[in-house]
Amino acid sequence: MLQIAIVGGTGYTGVELIRLLSSHPKVNIKWLTSRSEAGKPVASTFPSLRGISELTYSDLGEDTLSALTQCDVVFFATPHGVAMQQAEALVAAGVKVIDLAADFRLQSLQDFEHWYKHKHACPDLLKQAAYGLPEINREAIKSASVIGNPGCYPTTAILGLKPVIEAQNLASDALIEPRIIIDAKSGVSGAGRQAKLSLNYAETTDNFSAYGVAGHRHLPEIEQGVHVLLQSKFTQNIRFVPHLVPMIRGMFSTIHLGLTEAGCQLDLQAIYEQAYKDEPFIDVLPAGEFPDTRSVRASNRLRIAVHQNNSNKEATILVVQDNLVKGAAGQAVQCMNVMFGFEESLGLNHVPVVP
């Protein structure tokens, strides 16, 4: 039985980790930390966990490091900049680290410091970290000591692009035009649980807004996925615009591709189906169908629809996921399963919630 800790268990990704790991047959949650809720039962903060979890929040204070080194794996569901303060000591003690923030996502120190406004505390460890997207980086995750759990938007974008980029890598000529447009929408839970005027009910209900239009911190992560992890042999110029929509959870990314003459000769539907036929959490819908966010709610599933229009030389890739599960906590548990040699879907076979 793995002994685990969740650092930062009061945010939405933290409570999703508690929900998922409480029913995982191979783990025991040894520590659940929160300075603001220390001493309180988790079920008093989240009544949904009554009868499910008997855990109490702890503020380990000066004993944090010694307590966490008693664990096999530590999940950080904390703001950016927290995990990297503890990661080196934990790894030295043989503890695996899975960070749900951005400390270990970007391999470029320059990109990290530019977009996240932090000086990285352990650049040498960053070089050893694995990007936690199992569908493209499974082998690296298996042997990694540190996982940078992907951002929610990059998960949809990279997995939405993977089959066509890989097909293009095998072709002599480009299959898609250099310009890629990603139009993405997220429920408000993606902005976190903290109180903000822009996130209150009166501001978000019956409202729909774009943000990060001039530049969003997930853009370099998407670019890294395409050009480094997928090793695109053609340069792709990515335009990414996220939006906040009036729903609690869910994410819908629409990816617009221009097709070349060579690209129009291919059956993208067949390419996507073949690419993901063995992936337990990726569902490529039949031709002509459309995904919706409700179909993946509270699950670790990601659904893709491919729409190819050769007469207009274009393709539209539609991708949906739950931003808190496949876009965050579920993916972290999936990575843990890969790291420790468990069945990848263990503890994650939850049926999506409808309605």
UniProtKB/Swiss-Prot annotation:
GO terms for molecular function: N-acetyl-gamma-glutamyl-phosphate reductase activity; NAD binding; NADP+ binding. Disulfide bonds: none annotated. Keywords: Amino-acid biosynthesis, Arginine biosynthesis, Cytoplasm, NADP, Oxidoreductase. It is found in: Cytoplasm. The active site is at residue 152. Its main location: cytoplasm. InterPro entries: AGPR_AS, AGPR_type-1, NAD(P)-bd_dom_sf, NAGSA_dehydrogenase, Semialdehyde_DH_NAD-bd. It catalyses: N-acetyl-L-glutamate 5-semialdehyde + phosphate + NADP(+) = N-acetyl-L-glutamyl 5-phosphate + NADPH + H(+). GO terms for biological process: L-arginine biosynthetic process. Transmembrane segments: none annotated. The keyword NADP applies. Its EC number is 1.2.1.38. GO terms for cellular component: cytoplasm. Pathway: Amino-acid biosynthesis; L-arginine biosynthesis; N(2)-acetyl-L-ornithine from L-glutamate: step 3/4. Belongs to the NAGSA dehydrogenase family. Type 1 subfamily. Catalyzes the NADPH-dependent reduction of N-acetyl-5-glutamyl phosphate to yield N-acetyl-L-glutamate 5-semialdehyde. This is N-acetyl-gamma-glutamyl-phosphate reductase. It comes from Psychrobacter sp. (strain PRwf-1).
